Amino acid sequence: MKSSIFFKLLLLVSLLVVIFRQSYAVADYCNRDADCKRVCLRPYACNLTRHLCMCHPNDVSSSKQHCIPEHKGFGEGGPPPQRLKLYR
C-alpha cells in the first residue's frame, strides 16, 4: 500500500516538473515584445495569448562567424574541403 502511494506521488512530482520546465525553461517564453529580442531577429513580437515569441529564430549558425573565437585559426576560413572519392 505504501509503495502505491509513493509511486503515485513520484508520478505527480514528475508531471509537475515536466510542466514547469515546459512553461519556464523555454527560451521563447515572453510577456512583452522586448523579451523576444534575445532569441529573435527583427521583426519579432510576443503572442500574448500563448506567451510565445513569433519571429525568425536568432540562429547562431546563420551568423558570419562559424567558429569559436578562442580556437586556433579563428577567422582564417579553415582548410579547403576534401574531394570525395568516386567508386565505380
UniProtKB/Swiss-Prot annotation:
<protein>
    <recommendedName>
        <fullName>Putative defensin-like protein 256</fullName>
    </recommendedName>
</protein>
<dbReference type="GO" id="GO:0005576">
    <property type="term" value="C:extracellular region"/>
</dbReference>
<keyword id="KW-0611">Plant defense</keyword>
<keyword id="KW-0732">Signal</keyword>
<keyword id="KW-0929">Antimicrobial</keyword>
<feature type="disulfide bond">
    <location>
        <begin position="40"/>
        <end position="55"/>
    </location>
</feature>
<keyword id="KW-0964">Secreted</keyword>
<dbReference type="GO" id="GO:0031640">
    <property type="term" value="P:killing of cells of another organism"/>
</dbReference>
<keyword id="KW-0295">Fungicide</keyword>
<feature type="disulfide bond">
    <location>
        <begin position="30"/>
        <end position="46"/>
    </location>
</feature>
<feature type="disulfide bond">
    <location>
        <begin position="36"/>
        <end position="53"/>
    </location>
</feature>
<keyword id="KW-1015">Disulfide bond</keyword>
<comment type="similarity">
    <text>Belongs to the DEFL family.</text>
</comment>
<dbReference type="GO" id="GO:0050832">
    <property type="term" value="P:defense response to fungus"/>
</dbReference>
<feature type="signal peptide">
    <location>
        <begin position="1"/>
        <end position="25"/>
    </location>
</feature>
